[in-house]
Design a protein with these regions (language model features):
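Short amphipathic
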Residues: 10-20
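C-terminal binding/interaction regions
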Residues: 2-10, 71-75, 79-98
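Amphipathic, hydrophobic secondary-structure cores in small proteins
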Residues: 24-26, 30-83
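Short hydrophobic/aromatic-rich motifs at helix boundaries and adjacent loops
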Residues: 5, 13-15, 29-30
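Proteins with a high burden of low-complexity, intrinsically disordered sequence enriched in S/T/G/P/A and R
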Residues: 3-4, 17, 23
């Protein structure tokens, strides 16, 4: 069994590509931030060496994620792997300009 410190230190990462034809604009970014806040782990989008809090709509919009842009979805904490898995699937579901 992992110690609490080991669980809190769990880090998960996944490269993601934005598929929405309008990019990660306000509506999907707001949904993404809302879902990211549901996890106990801290979650970030990392792009071009900069980290943006996935729990903040403003931070997500600052990342300027247009269609085809790539970023690393990174989470640290006890549910990091679940956060990365579920949030990466959510990003893939934002299609057709919605």
């Amino acid at each position: 069994m992992k110690s609490k410190a080991a669980e809190d230190a769990t880090v998960a990462r996944r490269e993601v590509t934005i598929v929405n034809e309008l990019g990660l604009h306000a509506r999907p970014a707001a949904e993404f931030a809302r879902r990211a806040r549901a996890f106990r782990s801290e979650v970030w989008l990392v792009r071009e060496g900069k980290r943006f809090s996935a729990a903040s709509l403003i931070e997500i919009l600052r990342a300027n994620l247009d269609q085809g842009a790539t970023a690393t979805l990174e989470a640290k904490g006890r549910d990091a792997e679940a956060a990365v898995e579920k949030l990466s699937r959510l990003l893939e579901s934002f299609k057709d300009g919605k």
